Protein backbone atom coordinates (compact mmCIF):
# COMPACT_ATOMS: atom_id res chain seq x y z
CA UNK A 1 0.00 0.00 0.00
CA UNK A 2 2.85 2.39 0.86
CA UNK A 3 4.66 1.48 -2.34
CA UNK A 4 1.46 2.14 -4.30
CA UNK A 5 1.15 5.65 -2.82
CA UNK A 6 4.83 6.37 -3.48
CA UNK A 7 4.44 5.23 -7.08
CA UNK A 8 1.22 7.22 -7.51
CA UNK A 9 2.82 10.37 -6.12
CA UNK A 10 5.83 9.90 -8.39
CA UNK A 11 3.60 9.51 -11.46
CA UNK A 12 1.52 12.55 -10.49
CA UNK A 13 4.61 14.71 -10.00
CA UNK A 14 6.25 13.61 -13.23
CA UNK A 15 3.20 12.87 -15.37
CA UNK A 16 4.15 15.20 -18.22
CA UNK A 17 7.73 13.93 -18.38
CA UNK A 18 6.53 10.32 -18.29
CA UNK A 19 3.99 11.13 -21.02
CA UNK A 20 6.75 12.53 -23.22
CA UNK A 21 8.98 9.49 -22.63
CA UNK A 22 6.09 7.08 -23.30
CA UNK A 23 5.21 8.70 -26.63
CA UNK A 24 8.84 8.86 -27.77
CA UNK A 25 9.24 5.20 -26.80
CA UNK A 26 6.25 4.32 -29.01
CA UNK A 27 7.95 6.08 -31.92
CA UNK A 28 11.33 4.35 -31.43
CA UNK A 29 10.58 1.45 -33.84
CA UNK A 30 9.51 3.95 -36.52
CA UNK A 31 12.66 6.00 -35.89
CA UNK A 32 14.81 2.88 -36.16
CA UNK A 33 13.30 1.67 -39.43
CA UNK A 34 13.40 5.16 -40.94
CA UNK A 35 17.19 5.29 -40.46
CA UNK A 36 17.69 1.93 -42.16
CA UNK A 37 15.01 1.87 -44.85
CA UNK A 38 13.21 4.31 -47.15
CA UNK A 39 9.70 4.16 -45.69
CA UNK A 40 8.09 6.49 -48.19
CA UNK A 41 9.68 6.73 -51.62
CA UNK A 42 7.60 9.72 -52.71
CA UNK A 43 8.34 11.85 -49.64
CA UNK A 44 12.02 10.84 -49.77
CA UNK A 45 12.40 11.95 -53.39
CA UNK A 46 10.44 15.14 -52.62
CA UNK A 47 12.82 15.91 -49.73
CA UNK A 48 15.86 15.64 -52.02
CA UNK A 49 14.76 18.41 -54.40
CA UNK A 50 17.62 20.92 -54.17
CA UNK A 51 19.26 24.02 -55.69
CA UNK A 52 21.98 22.18 -57.63
CA UNK A 53 20.56 23.58 -60.89
CA UNK A 54 19.44 26.92 -59.49
CA UNK A 55 16.47 27.99 -57.38
CA UNK A 56 13.41 25.74 -57.41
CA UNK A 57 10.25 25.43 -55.31
CA UNK A 58 10.54 23.05 -52.33
CA UNK A 59 14.30 22.91 -52.75
CA UNK A 60 15.54 24.24 -49.39
CA UNK A 61 15.34 20.99 -47.39
CA UNK A 62 17.17 19.05 -50.08
CA UNK A 63 19.84 21.74 -50.22
CA UNK A 64 20.31 21.47 -46.45
CA UNK A 65 20.50 17.66 -46.63
CA UNK A 66 23.13 17.68 -49.39
CA UNK A 67 25.21 20.35 -47.63
CA UNK A 68 25.20 18.29 -44.42
CA UNK A 69 26.22 15.28 -46.53
CA UNK A 70 29.16 17.22 -48.01
CA UNK A 71 30.37 18.34 -44.58
CA UNK A 72 29.82 15.10 -42.63
CA UNK A 73 29.87 12.45 -45.39
CA UNK A 74 26.92 10.82 -43.63
CA UNK A 75 24.55 8.70 -45.69
CA UNK A 76 21.91 10.94 -47.30
CA UNK A 77 19.05 8.66 -46.30
CA UNK A 78 20.18 8.74 -42.67
CA UNK A 79 20.50 12.54 -42.66
CA UNK A 80 16.95 12.72 -44.00
CA UNK A 81 15.73 10.36 -41.26
CA UNK A 82 17.61 12.19 -38.46
CA UNK A 83 16.10 15.54 -39.48
CA UNK A 84 12.58 14.14 -39.18
CA UNK A 85 13.35 12.34 -35.92
CA UNK A 86 14.53 15.69 -34.54
CA UNK A 87 11.37 17.55 -35.58
CA UNK A 88 9.08 14.72 -34.48
CA UNK A 89 10.59 14.75 -30.98
CA UNK A 90 10.19 18.53 -30.82
CA UNK A 91 6.54 18.16 -31.88
CA UNK A 92 5.93 15.58 -29.15
CA UNK A 93 7.60 17.81 -26.55
CA UNK A 94 5.61 20.92 -27.51
CA UNK A 95 2.37 18.95 -27.76
CA UNK A 96 2.81 17.60 -24.22
CA UNK A 97 3.50 21.12 -22.93
CA UNK A 98 0.31 22.41 -24.55
CA UNK A 99 -1.76 19.53 -23.15
CA UNK A 100 -0.31 20.24 -19.71
CA UNK A 101 -1.84 23.72 -19.80
CA UNK A 102 -5.19 23.02 -21.44
CA UNK A 103 -6.36 19.79 -19.86
CA UNK A 104 -6.55 19.15 -16.14
CA UNK A 105 -8.71 16.07 -16.68
CA UNK A 106 -6.42 13.04 -16.89
CA UNK A 107 -8.74 11.05 -19.18
CA UNK A 108 -8.98 13.91 -21.71
CA UNK A 109 -5.21 14.40 -21.53
CA UNK A 110 -4.50 10.73 -22.30
CA UNK A 111 -7.15 10.67 -25.06
CA UNK A 112 -5.59 13.66 -26.83
CA UNK A 113 -2.06 12.38 -26.27
CA UNK A 114 -2.60 8.90 -27.74
CA UNK A 115 -5.32 9.76 -30.26
CA UNK A 116 -4.47 7.89 -33.52
CA UNK A 117 -5.66 10.85 -35.59
CA UNK A 118 -3.33 13.35 -33.93
CA UNK A 119 0.22 12.80 -32.73
CA UNK A 120 0.09 9.05 -33.38
CA UNK A 121 -1.10 9.31 -36.98
CA UNK A 122 2.33 8.39 -38.47
CA UNK A 123 2.29 5.15 -36.45
CA UNK A 124 -1.04 4.19 -38.01
CA UNK A 125 0.02 5.22 -41.50
CA UNK A 126 3.77 5.37 -42.12
CA UNK A 127 2.98 7.25 -45.33
CA UNK A 128 2.23 10.20 -43.06
CA UNK A 129 5.75 10.14 -41.64
CA UNK A 130 8.88 11.72 -43.18
CA UNK A 131 6.76 14.31 -44.97
CA UNK A 132 7.72 17.98 -45.06
CA UNK A 133 4.42 18.83 -43.40
CA UNK A 134 5.94 17.61 -40.11
CA UNK A 135 8.34 20.57 -40.16
CA UNK A 136 5.46 22.94 -40.93
CA UNK A 137 3.53 21.38 -38.04
CA UNK A 138 6.44 22.15 -35.69
CA UNK A 139 6.05 25.89 -36.27
CA UNK A 140 2.26 25.67 -35.89
CA UNK A 141 2.51 23.82 -32.56
CA UNK A 142 5.23 26.21 -31.35
CA UNK A 143 3.07 29.24 -32.19
CA UNK A 144 0.12 27.63 -30.37
CA UNK A 145 2.40 27.07 -27.38
CA UNK A 146 3.41 30.75 -27.37
CA UNK A 147 -0.23 31.85 -27.46
CA UNK A 148 -1.04 29.47 -24.65
CA UNK A 149 1.84 30.86 -22.57
CA UNK A 150 0.65 34.41 -23.24
CA UNK A 151 -2.95 33.71 -22.23
CA UNK A 152 -1.66 31.94 -19.11
CA UNK A 153 0.22 35.13 -18.18
CA UNK A 154 3.56 33.32 -18.51
CA UNK A 155 4.71 35.31 -21.53
CA UNK A 156 4.57 39.09 -21.89
CA UNK A 157 3.28 40.78 -25.03
CA UNK A 158 6.70 42.32 -25.70
CA UNK A 159 8.39 38.89 -25.51
CA UNK A 160 5.74 37.42 -27.81
CA UNK A 161 6.37 40.20 -30.33
CA UNK A 162 10.13 39.56 -30.14
CA UNK A 163 9.74 35.82 -30.75
CA UNK A 164 7.16 36.54 -33.45
CA UNK A 165 9.55 38.80 -35.37
CA UNK A 166 12.67 36.65 -34.92
CA UNK A 167 11.26 33.11 -35.17
CA UNK A 168 7.66 32.92 -36.40
CA UNK A 169 7.93 35.20 -39.46
CA UNK A 170 11.36 33.84 -40.58
CA UNK A 171 10.06 30.34 -39.83
CA UNK A 172 7.08 30.80 -42.15
CA UNK A 173 9.38 32.04 -44.93
CA UNK A 174 11.80 29.12 -44.45
CA UNK A 175 8.94 26.60 -44.33
CA UNK A 176 7.51 28.03 -47.57
CA UNK A 177 10.87 27.45 -49.25
CA UNK A 178 10.73 23.86 -47.95
CA UNK A 179 7.10 23.26 -48.98
CA UNK A 180 4.84 25.82 -50.66
CA UNK A 181 1.77 24.51 -48.84
CA UNK A 182 2.91 26.77 -45.98
CA UNK A 183 1.49 29.72 -47.97
CA UNK A 184 -2.03 28.36 -47.39
CA UNK A 185 -1.38 28.07 -43.65
CA UNK A 186 -0.35 31.70 -43.13
CA UNK A 187 -3.96 32.56 -42.06
CA UNK A 188 -3.57 30.07 -39.18
CA UNK A 189 -0.60 32.01 -37.80
CA UNK A 190 -2.31 35.32 -38.55
CA UNK A 191 -5.34 34.34 -36.45
CA UNK A 192 -3.08 33.23 -33.57
CA UNK A 193 -1.34 36.62 -33.58
CA UNK A 194 -4.73 38.30 -33.81
CA UNK A 195 -5.82 36.34 -30.77
CA UNK A 196 -2.76 37.51 -28.83
CA UNK A 197 -3.34 41.16 -29.74
CA UNK A 198 -6.97 40.91 -28.72
CA UNK A 199 -8.52 37.63 -27.66
CA UNK A 200 -12.01 39.01 -28.31
CA UNK A 201 -11.02 39.92 -31.88
CA UNK A 202 -12.11 43.54 -31.35
CA UNK A 203 -9.51 44.46 -33.93
CA UNK A 204 -12.17 43.60 -36.49
CA UNK A 205 -14.15 46.67 -35.44
CA UNK A 206 -13.35 49.91 -37.25
CA UNK A 207 -12.23 51.91 -34.18
CA UNK A 208 -9.62 49.26 -33.28
CA UNK A 209 -8.20 48.86 -36.76
CA UNK A 210 -5.50 51.51 -36.33
CA UNK A 211 -4.41 50.52 -32.83
CA UNK A 212 -0.58 50.66 -32.47
CA UNK A 213 -0.43 46.99 -31.47
CA UNK A 214 -1.94 46.02 -34.80
CA UNK A 215 1.15 47.20 -36.69
CA UNK A 216 2.73 43.84 -35.83
CA UNK A 217 0.31 42.21 -38.28
CA UNK A 218 2.05 44.01 -41.15
CA UNK A 219 5.00 41.65 -40.67
CA UNK A 220 2.90 38.98 -42.36
CA UNK A 221 3.49 40.84 -45.62
CA UNK A 222 7.07 39.51 -45.54
CA UNK A 223 5.77 35.92 -45.55
CA UNK A 224 4.55 36.41 -49.14
CA UNK A 225 8.12 37.02 -50.42
CA UNK A 226 8.64 33.35 -51.42
CA UNK A 227 5.46 33.50 -53.53
CA UNK A 228 6.95 36.22 -55.73
CA UNK A 229 10.27 34.37 -55.88
CA UNK A 230 8.38 31.31 -57.16
CA UNK A 231 6.91 33.45 -59.94
CA UNK A 232 10.36 34.77 -60.90
CA UNK A 233 11.85 31.26 -60.95
CA UNK A 234 9.31 28.92 -62.60
CA UNK A 235 9.95 25.18 -62.64
CA UNK A 236 10.98 23.67 -65.97
CA UNK A 237 11.05 19.95 -66.92
CA UNK A 238 14.69 20.33 -67.99
CA UNK A 239 15.71 21.62 -64.56
CA UNK A 240 13.85 18.79 -62.82
CA UNK A 241 15.57 16.16 -64.99
CA UNK A 242 18.99 17.64 -64.22
CA UNK A 243 18.25 17.66 -60.48
CA UNK A 244 17.13 14.01 -60.68
CA UNK A 245 20.41 13.07 -62.37
CA UNK A 246 22.40 14.90 -59.67
CA UNK A 247 20.42 13.19 -56.91
CA UNK A 248 20.92 9.74 -58.46
CA UNK A 249 24.66 10.35 -58.66
CA UNK A 250 24.80 11.22 -54.96
CA UNK A 251 22.21 8.70 -53.76
CA UNK A 252 21.20 5.84 -56.10
CA UNK A 253 18.31 4.91 -53.76
Describe the role of every protein-language-model region:
Residues 27-37, 211-253:
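Membrane-lumen/periplasm interface segments of specific transmembrane helices
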Residues 52-86:
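Short hydrophobic/aromatic helix or loop-helix immediately within or flanking a transmembrane segment
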Residues 59, 110-138:
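Aromatic- and kink-enriched transmembrane "portal" helix at the membrane-lumen/periplasm boundary
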Residues 82-105, 142-146:
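Transmembrane-helix motifs of polytopic, lipid-linked glycan transferases
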Residues 96-119, 159:
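Transmembrane-helix signature of polytopic, membrane-embedded enzymes
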Residues 134-154, 164, 188, 195:
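Specific aromatic-rich, kink-prone transmembrane helix
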Residues 162-180, 185-187, 191:
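Membrane-interface alpha helices of multi-pass inner-membrane proteins
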Residues 186-221:
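Perimembrane helix-loop-helix junctions
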